[in-house]
Amino acid sequence: EFRRVLFRSLDGAAARVEEEKRRDPSDRGQRAALRCEVSVPDAAVKAAAWERFKGEGYGSLHLTSAAMGGFQWYCQRELLAPYAERFFEDATGVFQERTHEFSRAWFVALFPDFRVERGVLDRSQRFLGTVSEELPTLVRSLREANDDLERAIKCREFATS
């Protein structure tokens, strides 16, 4: 799987990924290929993937989860900046309309925790204040993510002091 991610940084990456898909047609191979395809640092690829996450997905929870796992890369922070806000805009609907398993996978993969910034924490805390207790999984997930993000911010602040 790691070699597929590495391929994306090489010349002829798309052809190499296609060859890997032919070489390993198993479920594991399909999931690895989806992670790799969604990891492409291209705005159109990210937009199409986000819409699929919100819509029909990639055919199954496992394949969709794999694709979501390839979406966020810390080295793509500028490209992914709009999706931090979109996460908060879409979260309530995801938790209201989708299965528990999907909602949890969506949150774990797409919460913008790679952006260890006070602004993201503040936005997440404000959002938490608006979430109904009728969505306990979302409330709990936000509390846990906020705690993790706050610890990461404090660690970075300490490291630079």
Where are these regions (language model features)?
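Long, ordered, helix-rich scaffold segments
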Residues: 4-161
